[in-house]
Amino acid sequence: MKKTIFLLLFVFAFATLSKAQMYYEFTLPDLDGNDVSFGKIVDKSNVVMLSFWATWCTPCKEEMKKMADIYEKYKGQGFEYVAINNDNQKSVSKVKSFITAQGYTFPVLMDTDKKVFEGYSGKDEMPYSVIINKKKEIISVHTGFKTGDEVMIENEIKAALGIK
């Protein structure tokens, strides 16, 4: 019995670890309701950062503000930042107003049923971000955000882009 439980725990732990390391494609609507294929974004980029957020999440908004600057700095070098909102369907206009008011130019997608978020994270903590390289490998995962984290994230992006 102990062997069986240990084996099941090992298999579950391995499956969770593998899931966290896998990149997978998905399609979500943008703020105008147009379907956007994440696979197409990854195919045309060298490095992509996915960031899951919600309008009620203050650290999420702080991360987005810092990432907007990093996005502008490296987007011409193959970097793409994609913000994926997890608010419910009723909040789409609120999300759109927030993004417009901030002047953000990066793609914002809506994951109102949280399926993509759960597929990547498996947790309910935000912000939750993953950095994906040109080989479509998840090379970094970040949970939460505090001032100063953007320096580490920028260094990871630069390294993935091959910038010294």
Predicted regions and their residues:
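Sec-dependent N-terminal signal peptides
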Residues: T4-F14
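Sec/Tat signal peptide C-region and signal peptidase I cleavage site
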Residues: T16-A20
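Short, internal strand/loop/helix patches
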Residues: E25, F98-K134
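A short beta-strand-turn-helix
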Residues: T27-V47
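Short pre-active-site segment immediately N-terminal to redox-active cysteine/selenocysteine motifs
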Residues: S45-V48, F52-W56, E125
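Conserved hydrophobic packing residues within short motifs/helices of P-loop NTPase cores
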Residues: V48-L50, V82-I84, V130
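Structural microenvironment flanking redox-active thiols in thiol-disulfide oxidoreductases
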Residues: K61-Q102, D113-G119
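Thiol-/selenol-based redox modules, centered on thioredoxin-like
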Residues: Y128-K164
